[in-house]
């Protein structure tokens, strides 16, 4: 395969329909929030979704894996390109089950949840980006 087959209108048309990477609730939201430790405002580029350690993490939509490796601050990290400058980012993975350069379908397993995360509980970190700019992932996930 050499291309991603998204609906007409591309990834933009998928807003509000993306597969949740894991079953769980959002425990850290996108945007500016007060840091509980340092009591200062911090901007979060993504969300944390709580999940059981070793739970399967799924691709939110079809695309090409462009990064699948350790990344400081995110543990094991997978980045999927969906074309037109759109990417999804999956961090705090305990294991990665895909390789860079492969194409994945929405709902396909790409890894597992790590035993811990930088928020003190097992959770997957998830971002949606457009041309490098973070977007609110909660607006993109299936409601």
Regions found by a protein language model. Name each.
Residues 11-13, 36, 92-93, 113-114, ...:
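Short beta-alpha junctions and helix-cap segments that line functional grooves
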Residues 1-75, 79-81, 134-143:
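Extracytoplasmic/periplasmic cell wall- or extracellular glycan-interacting regions that localize
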